[in-house]
Amino acid sequence: MNLLNLLNPLNLFRTESKDTTPEGLTLNPEPDNPIPGHYFITERNEPIVSEIITAGNPILKAVAAPVTAFDKKLKFLILDMKKTLYEANGVGLAAPQIAVSKRIFVADDGESGFEAYINPEWQPDGDEMATDSEGCLSVPGLFGEVTRYARVIVRYQDIHGKKKVKKASGLLARCIQHETDHLNGILFIEKAISLHKGPKDEE
């Protein structure tokens, strides 16, 4: 078993008091986002698949902090999120879902391609609403009907900090709203009209 997979840099929690930081890892590198036992790999060549935390973890109920540093650590994080998203066969993934309380999500609706949304803010693009089924990688095995705006305008920053604006409709618009909810500590089950069981690996 790969040691780096065991020592997931974004989700490992350590309870012992002695310093057991593995070689090549740095403990708690970001004072503004302290997570006990949180490791960040400082030297590696490839992105990793991060563990996705599930409902009941307090990180999923917290309001995520804005991103202020557009540096190498952010690029590593985005690459990890991309690999984790595709490994899980998801449409969207928010940073809090891998225990990083930052205002970031990534998405790929199958048409627009992969995109990282940093510090996103959206607004409705019209009054039309749509109700459809949603799932969540952090709520495995449950799906629910959720009513959201059919079209949105999202403003965000890319991985270099450049400000962007995008119009979205359909699945991407739903994904943007769903993932932004994660950044505000909200799960789709809190908005669902009804819930039903289904496959455990979809979002």
Where do the protein language model's features map onto the residues?
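Positively charged
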Residues: 2-203
